[in-house]
Design a protein with these regions (language model features):
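Helix-terminus loop motifs that line ligand-binding clefts
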Residues: 172-200, 313-414, 546-564
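Active-site acid/base region of carbohydrate-active enzymes
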Residues: 28, 240-271, 277, 284-336, ...
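Amphipathic, well-ordered alpha-helical segments in soluble domains
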Residues: 298, 319, 356-363, 435-438, ...
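Extracellular/oxidizing-compartment recognition motifs
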Residues: 1-288, 297, 314-319, 334-348, ...
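Alpha-helical support elements that line or immediately flank enzyme active sites
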Residues: 147-166, 223, 234, 297-326, ...
């Protein structure tokens, strides 16, 4: 009878991290659940006449493997001489010993329910730069997060080292600053170099290494994802290289939205947002390779754009659970989930800043709007109520200091890293107001009228406080920055919306069409400028040389962390990719309405901007596919819309300037500039405007 073996190869991962001090102070071993690599397994076997389960127990054995080192940030080291072929578990001389039983970590073991991480794209070498006889640099043409797949011919004991980078300098030398784990080894300001602690490398670069056997050697990462466009190989000459590819690896999320228009640059922006997002999704919404943490603030800023581009039902649910699982004893939500020690300007008790704590109620609300899971809504409410109680423990004047504000703003005061965001206290107060508005709506959605009255009452009191403290005599707010105007308009705090919009537009024009807001302000700006019909301004912003075009110079295919020089930023960071929601909602015209439950209320409101000649847009909801396509012809604009028949409500919003000549039924409503048409049961319509 054939013999069957099951071999599990273990790595350190997040469970056995190196004692590396990220940013010079955060040691993951002090905050995460840690231990020696271990396994729990049940093997299910089904025969013709019976079923059998074999579980991991004291009869299992272990041995040392072929990997001599692995770390999620720093890389892998492998000895090719210890195994046969390409199978690192097919060891030549395994020394099997009885396993040691462990109680394992605390908590409840839950089966994974999200899409898995997989290889989705392969890139070949676009250029090879030879440094010397035993060193060369490969350019793959685009930044990916993933693995190297390398085949070489080598001699016995030949050592090959790989160094990864997102960038090169003017001398074509690798510039690894943007991927140094936790800035370790980077000079962040003059005379200040981040120290990673005892045993840490001088520079926490992304590196792999392997010892060769004589003949063919095949190396492919197993335990470390790198963020890179360039890789430097040392220890071999170029003639020994047989094949090399960069493999993009990420959680495989199904695309549920597409966008294409007449402007190739706008199409590139759409693809860049998609690629940068995926590069940083590995079971959690990570920020960049330097940290790989799920920051609540980043998730909030990108939540709308994410849900239009990808099927996010499962991974949003997991993210909600992740933040709930790490709620602190006081009821507050952490800055990242899992919590790993960072709590910059937090509310206290290891909790995160106000805007970052918004991730829990905001994601729950977005999930309900798009996916309609009422059970998730009900199960989450007690945690949201405890969160509100934890926020109420702080005096209002103290609470509004507990945030990082509109992070990433161009007008951030770099001399005051933690408190330099524009209109900091005002935006913090708005975040608190938003917490209360969201929980009130959730209570209303669940039919809890008394709780709705309670929280909407609290929200109204905070609104009055905001108006009394931060409203200026001229109707503006706080420091009169772009951020302050955007927040005031988004949260409907202005007496005269039109006047405030014009003042904001004037500020943007004075900056040569540059929107200086940070990640929250930009996300909100895309919403308000579409809502109030100023979409041409957003196109001007997206096209301005000092904005995304500068980010994408030198054939860049991913977004950077910051605008400007990006001195201390990543070159593979998605936090400013929220514009993709505007492409869907404004140019593409497809919006899942605020009052929707499981995407059952849809607004079709395309913006026929003068500089765009056609748009093809689609979005797959849980109720079916929605399409909105429009094209300019000499005789007018042809608009084609397809909607499923199972919607509660679908409204078409069109400017009054267009004559429909009875192509649609009479409008059901109108405002100053638009007619509104009920197309709930239309299925497919085609009109000429």
């Amino acid at each position: 009878q054939p013999k069957n073996e099951v071999i599990v190869e273990l790595a350190d991962g997040w469970f056995n991290p190196a004692p590396l001090k990220l940013f010079g102070k955060y040691n993951l071993r002090e905050t995460l659940t840690i231990g020696e690599p271990q396994v729990i397994a049940d093997i299910y076997m089904k025969f013709a006449d019976r079923e059998m389960i074999i579980g991991s127990d004291a009869d299992w054995q272990y041995c040392e493997g072929a990997y001599t080192f692995n770390n999620i940030y720093l890389g892998e080291r492998l000895d090719m001489k210890l195994f046969r072929g390409d199978n690192t578990t097919d060891l030549l001389m395994p020394d099997w010993k009885n396993v040691v039983l462990s109680n394992g970590p605390e908590g409840r073991l839950v089966s994974s329910f999200i899409p898995k991480i997989n290889h989705t794209l392969s890139l070949g070498a676009e250029h090879i730069h030879v440094v010397d006889e035993e060193t060369f640099i490969i350019d793959f043409g685009a930044i990916i997060t993933g693995f190297i797949d390398l085949s070489i011919t080598a001699s016995e004991n030949q050592r090959v080292e790989l160094l990864y980078s997102e960038d090169v300098d003017e001398n074509y030398e690798l510039n690894t600053d943007s991927t140094l784990a936790g800035f370790v080894g980077k000079q962040v300001t003059e005379g200040v170099i981040i120290d990673g602690g005892i045993g840490a490398p001088a520079r926490a670069e992304q590196k792999d290494a392997f010892e060769c056997r004589s003949g063919k050697n095949h190396f492919i990462n197993a335990f470390t994802c790198h963020s890179f466009r360039y890789v430097q190989l040392s220890g071999i000459n170029i003639e020994q290289l047989n094949n090399v590819q960069a493999l993009s690896v990420h959680t495989v999320l199904r695309e549920n939205g597409g966008f294409y228009c007449s402007d190739p640059y706008i199409n590139k922006l759409f693809e860049v947002a998609k690629r940068t997002k995926l590069n940083n999704i590995h079971s959690v919404f990570g920020d960049c390779a330097r940290e790989r943490f799920a920051y609540g603030g980043d998730i909030v800023a990108l939540a709308r754009s994410q849900v239009y581009q990808f099927d996010s039902a499962a991974i949003y649910k997991k993210t909600i659970f992740d933040f709930i699982n790490d709620i602190r004893p006081c009821g507050g939500v952490t800055e990242t989930a899992p919590f790993m020690g960072i709590k910059t300007n937090g509310v206290g008790g290891e909790t995160g800043p106000l805007g970052w704590q918004l991730v829990l109620p905001y994601l729950i609300a977005i999930h309900y709007r798009h996916y309609g899971n009422v059970n998730l809504l009900a199960e989450s409410l007690p945690f949201l109520e405890k969160q509100i109680l934890s926020l109420e423990m702080r005096d209002f004047d103290d609470l509004v200091t507990c945030c990082l504000g509109d992070w990433g703003s161009r007008v951030h005061d770099m001399r005051n890293y933690k408190n330099g965001s524009p209109a900091l206290h005002f935006t913090s107060a708005c975040f608190y107001y938003y917490h209360l508005l969201i929980i009130a709506k959730i209570c209303d959605d669940l039919g809890f009228k008394e709780k709705w009255l309670k929280y909407i009452g609290k929200a109204n009191k905070i609104r009055e406080k905001i108006l009394s403290l931060y409203k200026n005599t001229d109707g503006s707010f706080a420091d009169r920055s772009q951020t302050s105007f955007v927040f005031a308009i988004y949260f409907d705090l202005c007496d005269d919306i039109e006047s405030s919009l014009n003042a904001l537009i004037d500020l943007i024009k004075k900056e040569q069409n540059v929107i200086t807001c940070g990640i929250f302000g930009q996300s909100f700006a895309y919403e308000i400028f579409h809502r109030y019909g100023h979409n041409e301004l957003i196109l001007e912003w997206l096209r301005v040389e000092a904005g995304f075009k500068k980010m994408l110079k030198n054939d860049a295919s991913t977004l950077k962390e910051f605008f400007g020089d990006n001195l201390n930023g990543s070159n593979n960071h998605a936090m400013f990719s929220s514009y993709s929601s505007w492409l869907f909602q404004a140019l593409g015209g497809i919006t899942v309405a605020e009052e929707a439950v499981g995407a059952d209320v849809i607004l079709i409101s395309p913006s026929f901007t003068d500089t765009i000649n056609f748009v093809d847009c689609w979005h797959q909801t849980i109720r079916g596919r929605i399409e909105c396509r429009w094209r300019r012809y000499k005789k007018g604009i042809e608009l084609v819309i397809k909607v499923p028949f199972n919607l509660k409500k679908c409204t078409l919003k069109l400017p009054k300037v267009y004559q429909l000549n009875k192509q649609l039924p009479a409008p059901i409503d109108c405002d100053t500039y638009h007619h509104f048409y009920d197309i709930t049961d239309a299925g497919e319509i085609k009109v000429l405007l």
